[in-house]
Curated annotation (Swiss-Prot):
PANTHER family: KERATIN ASSOCIATED PROTEIN 3-3-RELATED (PTHR23260), KERATIN-ASSOCIATED PROTEIN 3-1 (PTHR23260:SF3). This is Keratin-associated protein 3-1. InterPro entries: Keratin_matx. GO terms for molecular function: structural molecule activity. The keyword Repeat applies. Transmembrane segments: none annotated. Keywords: Keratin, Repeat. The gene is KRTAP3-1.
Amino acid sequence: MYCCALRSCSVPTGPATTFCSFDKSCRCGVCLPSTCPHEISLLQPICCDTCPPPCCKPDTYVPTCWLLNNCHPTPGLSGINLTTYVQPGCESPCEPRC
């Protein structure tokens, strides 16, 4: 429940990994849905109620962030500096706030 309240994102239960390049930040308002079972593609962020400006920008395209699930292989991103953030699954279900 704590991890859900902290993130407040519409991420399904289970572990998920977000890859971000150093020129973008995937925290505060960038809530990405799972790409599974679809192909990995660039996703549009969703604004969360708990995120103040300027982090929270609805309808803003973030081309440098991907959300991966373990049913997808890691995309070939050679030559790009990446930072990996791992969001653990929640122990108990909670309501999404996005």
